[in-house]
Amino acid sequence: MPKLQGFEFWSRALGGARHVVAPMVDQSELAWRLLSRRHGAQLCYTPMLHAQVFVRDANYRKENLYCDVCPEDRPLIVQFCANDPEVFVQAALLAQDYCDAIDLNLGCPQMIAKRGRYGAFLQEEWDLLQRMILLAHERLSVPVTCKIRVFPEIDKTVRYAQMLEKAGCQLLTVHGRTKEQKGPMAGTASWEHIKAVRKAVGIPVFANGNIRCLQDVERCIQDTGVQGVMSAEGNLHNPALFEGRSPAVWELADEYLDIVRQHPCPLSYVRAHLFKLWHHTLQVHQQLREELAKVKTLEGVAAVSQALKLRCQEDMARQQEGVRPADNLPAFHWICQPYIRPGPKEGSKENSSGRSKRALEEEEGSMEGLSKNKLKKQLRNPHKTFDPSLKPKYAKCDQCGNPKGNRCVFNLCRGCCKKRAFRETADCPGHDCFLRPN
């Protein structure tokens, strides 16, 4: 059977999908994809997989794809990051029997992508990208697709898209932000760029960016002429977005937990999803946020979900008619709704330099100066000191800089003291080292 291409691929293999769930690291796992499909998603992507690791590590393949699919999870596109044509194709060949297409990630703007030379940081290397797409197009039995970010210039973005199409890309997802637009500096995605790409290419185009509700989906399709719309953050905060519904936050959480019992995933994924779903409620009920951060089993998570449901129902019962939601929210905290990322503060480093670091999730805490992992540990161990300025100071070894022994006669650490004692045939009672002859 000949490989489907372009619009035939979109209409037949993908069923003319218009509502698409984005590839999200540690977030678009099988259980979440199944939940999204129950509520209107017509196509899903796997989380981004590293092609090089996928090729060399059988356990990575098993855990991240082979055991993370099921018959109901179709159509499905597997996404890879790569910067070597042969490695990309080898990984794709190992994955193609489990999906309907292979996607090359050309949109990740994070610093880890810059260090690894993949994602949006390949967008200037057109010769390399042509070779990667062409080789995949020639050797795979399924189509190859791409997810890109735009350039500031519309005409360069159009030429970029046309280059990928000419190389063999059969479907293009365009995120209407540049690689510099991320975190607090994300701003608004440019549908004008997406519209220009759609007019200039002869393959299906999906739009990504500024999608918070079903009305945004419909408006985006109408304004840009794209074949479908991809949602990431909007989907995480309301998996029923494509249905045009805004259910109670515990309703979708309980449904998701039921799916996880059938299709297990790491508890960290579950916790991250619930932090998103319950974002606004956890601002009201801080204790539940701390409990969610500490639980170590799925049943513990379910107990927190039940407690949250009871708290929300009590809030609903106390709600007076005609009172508006607090903090200018579009709905009360117990209703699934979009999260509006705050912009940079006036005079902040991000605002003045144009550079931004990935923002910590607000639900993880607001202790400045701590890493994301430290924040998680702080929530689990509230009495432990994580501030480096409050930790005890140790005098340093005169030679290597490690902490010295408090009773060492040479002011050295154990290792340096032992070497000196052997060299000089000397004693150090502090390190219980006696070498001087009696």
From Swiss-Prot:
Alphabetical UniProt keywords: Cytoplasm, Flavoprotein, FMN, NAD, NADP, Nucleus, Oxidoreductase, tRNA processing
PROSITE patterns tied to this protein: UPF0034 (PS01136)
Biased composition (Basic residues): 373-383
GO cellular component: cytoplasm; nucleus
Main location: cytoplasm
Record-linked Gene3D superfamilies: Aldolase class I
Record's catalysed reaction(s): 5,6-dihydrouridine(16) in tRNA + NADP(+) = uridine(16) in tRNA + NADPH + H(+); 5,6-dihydrouridine(16) in tRNA + NAD(+) = uridine(16) in tRNA + NADH + H(+); 5,6-dihydrouridine(17) in tRNA + NAD(+) = uridine(17) in tRNA + NADH + H(+); 5,6-dihydrouridine(17) in tRNA + NADP(+) = uridine(17) in tRNA + NADPH + H(+)
Chain segments carrying region Disordered: 343-387
Residues the record marks as active site: C108 (proton donor)
Localization: Cytoplasm; Nucleus
Single GO BP term: tRNA dihydrouridine synthesis
GO molecular function: flavin adenine dinucleotide binding; tRNA dihydrouridine synthase activity; tRNA-dihydrouridine16 synthase activity; tRNA-dihydrouridine17 synthase activity
Family: Belongs to the Dus family. Dus1 subfamily.
Identification of the protein by name: tRNA-dihydrouridine(16/17) synthase [NAD(P)(+)]-like
Species this protein is from: Rattus norvegicus (Rat)
